[in-house]
Each structure stands twice: as structure tokens, then as C-alpha cells.
């Protein structure tokens, strides 16, 4: 029981340290990225580089995930409380979201199409080169 309590406290302390470091970075680098996101990035880097082991934070993270719905209730209450303000500012909120979504979809679509064409062209070019090498017509081949 005491060991499990120690593991829980250790995991919550590590998560709190990552959050505090993220808030510190957000304070010194005013980029508009919240401290919690910086903290998540630091935690991700720590986990991927194995500076932080997954079992060190597992208990605290699973506890927070289990009660995530309860933790988001204040946000929902805030949205309901200030719904009149949100309705007044709907143009300012919706237009950038719709435009950025459309631009993102277009860019991803064109990029995907371009990369698909490049990949299929490379595959076809390799086929032609292979066929010409088999037939012995390498003098006409220009790469």
C-alpha cells in the first residue's frame, strides 16, 4: 500500500514538474503556445529519449485520464455561462476556423497528390530503366 502510494506521488510529481517547466518556457518564450502544451512536449521528449520511464508516470496519468470528464466540467460550465458572448463574437471565431480548415485540406490534398505522382513516376522510371538494361539499350538512357 505504501509502495503504491509512493508510485502515485512520484508519478504526480513528475507530471507536475513537466507542467511547471512548460509554464516556465511559456513565460520566457512568448510564442502563444500554452505552458501545458510545452509540458506535454517535454514529457513526450522525456519518454521518447527514455529519460522518463513509462512506469514512473503510469499511475498518475491513468488516474488523471480516469477522471478526465470531471476535470473538463469547469470548461463546459464556462462555455454555457458565456454563451451570449460567444454568440456575439461568432464571426471572429468561425471565419478563421473555417478558412484555416479549408486551406489545410487544400494544402494536404495537393501535397498528397504531388507526392503520389512523384512516387508513381519514380516507380515507372525504374521499370523503364530496368527494361532498357535487359535489352542492352543503355546508350540511349538519360537519367
Curated annotation (Swiss-Prot):
Transmembrane intervals: 1-21, 33-52, 60-80, 92-112
UniProt keyword Transmembrane, yes or no: yes
This protein's record includes keyword Cell membrane: yes
Coiled coil, from the record: none
GO terms under cellular component: plasma membrane
Annotated Pfam families: LrgA
Subcellular location: Cell inner membrane
Principal place of residence: membrane
Membrane topology classification: Multi-pass membrane protein
Keywords of the record: Cell inner membrane, Cell membrane, Membrane, Transmembrane, Transmembrane helix
Family: Belongs to the UPF0299 family.
Name this protein carries in UniProt: UPF0299 membrane protein CGSHiEE_04225
Amino acid at each position: 500500500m505504501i509502495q503504491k502510494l509512493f508510485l502515485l506521488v512520484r508519478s504526480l510529481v513528475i507530471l507536475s514538474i513537466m507542467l511547471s517547466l512548460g509554464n516556465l518556457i511559456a513565460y520566457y518564450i512568448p510564442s502563444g503556445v500554452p505552458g501545458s502544451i510545452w509540458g506535454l512536449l517535454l514529457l513526450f521528449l522525456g519518454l521518447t529519449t527514455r529519460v522518463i520511464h513509462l512506469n514512473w508516470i503510469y499511475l498518475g496519468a491513468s488516474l488523471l485520464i480516469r477522471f478526465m470528464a470531471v476535470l473538463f466540467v469547469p470548461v463546459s460550465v464556462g462555455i454555457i455561462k458565456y454563451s451570449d458572448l460567444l454568440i456575439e463574437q461568432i464571426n471572429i471565431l468561425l471565419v478563421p476556423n473555417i478558412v484555416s480548415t479549408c486551406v489545410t485540406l487544400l494544402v494536404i490534398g495537393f501535397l498528397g497528390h504531388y507526392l503520389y505522382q512523384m512516387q508513381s513516376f519514380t516507380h515507372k522510371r525504374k521499370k523503364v530503366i530496368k527494361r532498357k538494361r535487359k535489352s542492352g539499350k543503355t546508350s540511349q538512357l538519360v537519367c
